[in-house]
């Protein structure tokens, strides 16, 4: 093993001695194989004299390691301003870009004083302010998603444009809201600096869209952004801040806050309330003056929203054919709820009955529930006609029809009903049976 290899191992040693380090350097020729300078620049709290010795020995501050990092980037990332200064004095390029197309100015970790000191150092040695754009289309300031006010204003004072957006159209407020812990105070001073709180990005999302879509609801931020944004403004996916709040199961009082600022409640908002089973929000919307009708009840049945069905039912809003749509959706719980509330099993839509659709869906469980609730003879007649017309499998309904006829003697007294029933059963019993063996006898 070369001495340079042992020098790379020494970088990991906790108690480093500068004299030992110098002795090791005396027998080393820089090879570039072990990225020695990079390794030592990445040690937190390292005495800058170690770096100075490496630089004097011939290690270049302008070479990249295997990850595309320069020593200056590494020192900036770990917030070691003394090493940053040492590298700059020895010719490190403050405008070099790593593999993410970021210059050292992008790495602004540390306290406000430390960050401002590092900015001053980099600018003093020629860092260019406005010509670096990373992979997301951000300059150094825009890439910093959670800056302090002091740092933000410091960078602006040396030439950064505060109103730029990234390649997705997101400005500083958008990007701050995407950080782990966005703060209303940060957004407030950004707004005072002229950054728009209502600007949509390329997907049509305003800052209010973003904060309303977050799992954690930052009420203070919503209150701050609410006056500047229409809560019904849709992004390109059709979502508004209001619908995003509903979709993320936000508390009703917060949704009410947005509704109170809106002059119009759209049908889309009502539909989303129903889809997400938000009867509490339906009540808020109703108090706002929105009227519901049978179409809303039908949708609630189709999506299986028991709460919304109950709310609408309590407010005398129904759909006469609700049972039919519950069968189509195959929501057994909804079927049970409607049966309990005495909804008719005799719904007929476009010639289809609830029973014929059970056969079409091959759902004997729901069929058995419906047959126990006494469909009329006319309904059963239409059911048989529909099954025969569409050539559906009769096997699951034959036992139910036989029992129905047995329990309804009047059914057979009607010539039309009885003839249809006889043909229905006879065709099923004789289906696929060949009588060719009897040809010689006739």
UniProtKB/Swiss-Prot annotation:
ANK repeats lie at residues 67-96, 100-131, 203-233, 237-267, 292-321, 323-347. InterPro entries: Ankyrin_rpt, Ankyrin_rpt-contain_sf, Multifunctional_ANK_Repeat. It holds the Pfam family Ank_2. Gene3D superfamilies: Ankyrin repeat-containing domain. Induction: Expressed in the early phase of the viral replicative cycle. It is found in: Host cytoplasm. The keyword Endoplasmic reticulum does not apply. GO terms for cellular component: host cell cytoplasm. Transmembrane segments: none annotated. Keywords: ANK repeat, Early protein, Host cytoplasm, Host-virus interaction, Modulation of host cell apoptosis by virus, Repeat. GO terms for biological process: symbiont-mediated perturbation of host apoptosis. Belongs to the orthopoxvirus OPG037 family. PANTHER family: ANKYRIN, ANKYRIN REPEAT-CONTAINING. Inhibits host apoptosis. Acts by associating with host apoptosome. May interact with host caspase-9-Apaf-1 complex. This is Inhibitor of Apoptosis OPG037. The lineage of its organism: Viruses, Varidnaviria, Bamfordvirae, Nucleocytoviricota, Pokkesviricetes.
